[in-house]
Design a protein with these regions (language model features):
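Hydrophobic/aromatic-lined pockets within catalytic cores
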Residues: 69, 86, 126, 151-155
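Hydrophobic/aromatic-rich, well-ordered segments within soluble, folded domains that form packed cores
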Residues: 67-102
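Acidic, low-complexity, intrinsically disordered interaction modules
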Residues: 20-35
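Extreme N-terminal tail/first-helix region
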Residues: 5-19, 37-59
Length: 169
């Protein structure tokens, strides 16, 4: 029978050897994980639910949708509304909310709430009178990465249509 996991630290310690070589994760002098690995390990612990938690907190998804419909992103939610592959950004947020490969992207798009929300907000951007660049400014590159990712793992038409509209395919 497997050992009960009581905390995030227990989870990380139990699975560290399975995920990577423990020596590359842990500072031998302190016995603690190197700081750069904490967001990734934490994301693995939280799984796909980290997106739901972030989108639901403070009604953030609704705020994001309203901002997109109004034609301008004003607040900070891009990482968990339009996720992209891990490694494309360097911030703690991009590491924590980065998609860890095609399998996790498929899990994301197969989750009924996450799929419906991503399709809804993508359609809101697509149908807006303003361009993706006007709505998102410098964050348009994150939207591009998101659209390319999900167009590659599913057959939902809006992602391919979006990529075609902006010549991203």
């Amino acid at each position: 029978m497997s050992e009960k996991i009581n905390s995030k630290e227990d989870f990380i310690n139990q699975y560290a050897d399975k995920i990577w070589d423990r020596a590359s994760l842990v500072n031998p002098e302190t016995g603690r994980f190197y700081d750069e690995h904490i967001p990734i390990l934490s994301a693995l612990y939280h799984g796909i639910d980290r997106f739901i938690e972030a989108q639901d907190k403070y009604n953030t998804y609704q705020t994001a949708l309203e901002e997109v419909k109004a034609g301008r992103k004003k607040t900070h939610w891009i990482w968990y509304i339009f996720p992209q592959m891990r490694g494309l950004g360097t911030s703690e947020m991009s590491k924590f909310y980065g998609i860890n490969g095609r399998d996790e992207a498929t899990q994301y798009i197969n989750h009924p709430v996450l799929r419906d929300r991503l399709v809804e907000i993508t359609e809101a951007v697509y149908n807006n009178d303003k361009t993706v660049y006007e709505i998102f400014g410098n964050d348009a590159i994150k939207v591009r990465s998101c659209m390319l990712l999900f167009a590659s793992v599913c057959d939902i038409p809006i992602f391919k249509q979006f990529n075609y509209k902006y010549n991203w395919d």
